[in-house]
From Swiss-Prot:
Stretches of the chain forming a coiled coil according to its record: none
Domain of life: Bacteria
Family: Belongs to the phenylalanyl-tRNA synthetase beta subunit family. Type 1 subfamily.
Domain tRNA-binding residues, every copy: 39-148
Assigned EC number: 6.1.1.20
Every FDX-ACB domain range: 698-791
Protein known as: Phenylalanine--tRNA ligase beta subunit
Summary of subunit composition and partner proteins: Tetramer of two alpha and two beta subunits.
Organism from which the protein derives: Acinetobacter baylyi (strain ATCC 33305 / BD413 / ADP1)
Main location per the UniProt record: cytoplasm
One family name in Pfam for this protein: B5
Disulfide bonds: none
One GO CC term on file: phenylalanine-tRNA ligase complex
Keyword Transcription: no
Amino acid sequence: MKISESWLRTWVNPAIDSTTLADQLTMLGLEVDELAPVAKPFTGVVVGEVLTVEQHPDADRLRVTTVNIGNGEPLQIVCGAPNLRVGMKAPVATIGAVLPGEFKIKKGKLRGIESQGMLCGASEIDLEDKIDGLLELPEDAPVGLNIREYLKLDDNIIDISITPNRGDCFSIRGIARDLAVLNQLEVTPPDIQAVEATLNEQKQVHLETEGAPRYLGRIIKNVNVKATTPEWMAQALAASGIRTHSILVDVTNYVLMELGQPMHAFDLAKLNGAIHVRQASAQEKLTLLNDQNVELNEDIMVIADDAKVLAIAGIMGGLESSVTDDTQDIFLESAFFAPLAIAGRARRFGLHTDSSQRFERGVDFELPLLAMNRASQLIQQFAGGEFGPITVAENTALLPKREAIELNQQQVSQLLGYEVETDFIADALTRLGCQVAVKAQGEWVVVAPSHRFDITIYQDLIEEVARIHGYDNIQIRLPKIDVKLAKYQDHLELGQLRQTIATLGYQEAISFSFADLKLEKQLNPDVNPLALANPISSDLAVMRSTLLSSLIPCVQHNLNRQQNRVRFFELGLRFDYQNAASIHDLQQTPTLALIAVGSSVPEQWHGKTQPMDFFDLKHDIEQILAAGRVKVEYVRSERAWLHPGQSAEILIAGQSIGYLGRLHPSLENDLDLGVTWVAELDQQAILQSYVSNFTELSRFPSVRRDIALLISDKINVSDIQQLIKQTGGDLLDSTWLFDVYTGQGVEEGKRSLAFALLWQHPSRTLEDAEIKSGMDNIIEVLENTYQATLRAS
């Protein structure tokens, strides 16, 4: 929005220069995009009066004039302007004048006739040309007065970018209000007096829609629509980028820019009956002031009479009821339209008007009467007329409510991060137009003014305090962090985990936490997943209880595209339904999931690839857990969706942290998959295992002893290893299986298992007797527990 600096200073005039004024507006949140002079610098141009006009003897298009500039003898000037005439007043560039573009005026001759200056058009003094020819000045323009002074060309135009929340600042009044508060000055508005009614004639107004809580109208008769717009008004409008049209249009535009209230004048003779503010009917048509034909529908609010639509409310008037040069009587409108009733309607018709721009953001609902009085005052002053009483139609229940907001000193300090004086807070809010009541020391109850639609919560009030106190006054201090920061080590370990899995040939998948109900039931029939109220698709309708319900579709997608080796992992969240008595008990568990199909290694030239098996997957799991140097155990898994003979639970310190294995063949068949290997582990357990626990390495020699056992093939190897570890005690450092044999020499139903046992003491060398005693105890326990026997060498 563009405004004249001099116009703004008639409302509030702080003792600061133009640049500082622009900086203050920007710091108030009214960002100044440009501060530019009304006209470029020039000198030596004054108001002149044409005394005589004679034809040039040697040029048909030139004439010789004498011009009075109020200083000595009249000047002889040769001019070719078509509108040149005796008695007119126009700008005169005298000898020595320098016009924009460094154009210097010198004494010269045109076709043999001496010319002592130049009569100027608008463009020659950096103004917009309205006509072809000289810039005609009013008859009362003082001869000899510097044209820059007379036309106020030493003024500046301030171009301000108004944010959507500050609809109240689309006017001189709104900007002056904030500027006055910042500089602790009083606003000096024009003296607006109500124009008394001189005739008793009114239009009935019916409010038939909730979008128009307040509507004012006034009949004005015998208006001189051909009256000349005063120069000061034309200059103010020109500075705002608004062309002058006629006195009525110029007055309503002036009130729009001055007070921020859109207004409209209808030709009274073209209105039939009462005024109705209503919603349009489907397919109602209207020709707008810009000659655009539009078709309306039920969500468009209109102004109508008893017979037809007159205007789109808050956007643009209709051509049929518009004021023309033949208009004598008018009906003047000033209203409050609800922002939501106007928002988006103008753009629907490809329009963007000053009126819609303001109503969309919110116009002060207490402003229509003041604006009506101001417009009436200006019309009476410059166009005359007889005025009827002001008709007020309103539904106060539909006017915006001004709710009380509680504010205290602590809230201000906490949000801003520094102390603002109590008196300043109350004073600033009061000067901004808020109603401020003291509740207690440092506590207030505040009601926002009618023009501020953006103040609804206490944070909005604190923002106002900060604006007026000055953003540049915010103290420089180090931030105070009250929140608990995430441990960097956790992020480091998570990144390390991702990198470890990626080096094993898996690609990371990132999927939704939503899953297909059917797949969830196939994986775990006992689970009743939480259904989404508004799923994005039918196959993403529940919250997943396992990451496999997200990874399996990824595998299917890739297999269907000729990818015969697929390996994915995901670090994500799953819902734990097991211990949830209600929805409120549900918890999400960070989980690592693996899925693999195809060969154990990519196809290679130097060797035959083998299908992936249980031990390949177990190797990957052990690589993932190896960084933690924790002791991992495996026991048979009883999960229904896993292969009963090729799956296991993963234990650390006796607690299950997940599982690994092959999907059950029947499930593979249902899902149209080949042999598919999967694993799921508790992510937190993995990261906790990464915590380093250092123990001093023994400097004393270790001793290895091997035993080969004949034992039933029904007994799990993990159970045997667990028993060996428990029996061996602290001196047994580790044990592992290194040979399995069945066949000749081993009776049916049994197998030979060979274990290595590593013995070591942390602070001394073990004696043979100690090792022998330990070995004997282990063999005895195995014999008694599993009927194991030593295999003969």
